[in-house]
A protein has these predicted regions:
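A short, Lys/Arg-rich alpha-helix, primarily the initiator
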Residues: 1-17
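The alpha-helix within a helix-turn-helix
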Residues: 11, 22, 50
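Short alpha-helical DNA-recognition segment
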Residues: 15-33
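Short, basic-rich loop-to-helix N-cap that marks the start of a DNA-contacting helix
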Residues: 38-51
Length: 71
């Protein structure tokens, strides 16, 4: 699973709010909602975030293996 917990930390460090992403960079509330819920986000959106925040993908996203269950 890809999680975006680091995104919110990086945004805070860079002084970028969700409101600013919506107002100045035309992010939709749906895009932000998917990020909050660790949902599907396309690579274009991730690229935009890296450009806006001047950061690497590892500063906004992290891969965490799904827990395997025995069937």
């Amino acid at each position: 699973m890809i999680v975006y917990d680091k995104l919110w930390v990086t945004m805070k460090e860079k002084g970028i709010t969700q409101y600013k992403l919506m107002k100045d960079y035309h992010f939709s509330s749906g895009q932000l909602d998917r990020l909050r819920k660790n949902g599907n986000v396309n690579t274009y959106t991730l690229n935009q975030l890296c450009e806006i925040l001047n950061c690497d993908i590892s500063d906004i996203a992290e891969y965490i293996p799904d827990k395997k269950t025995d069937a």
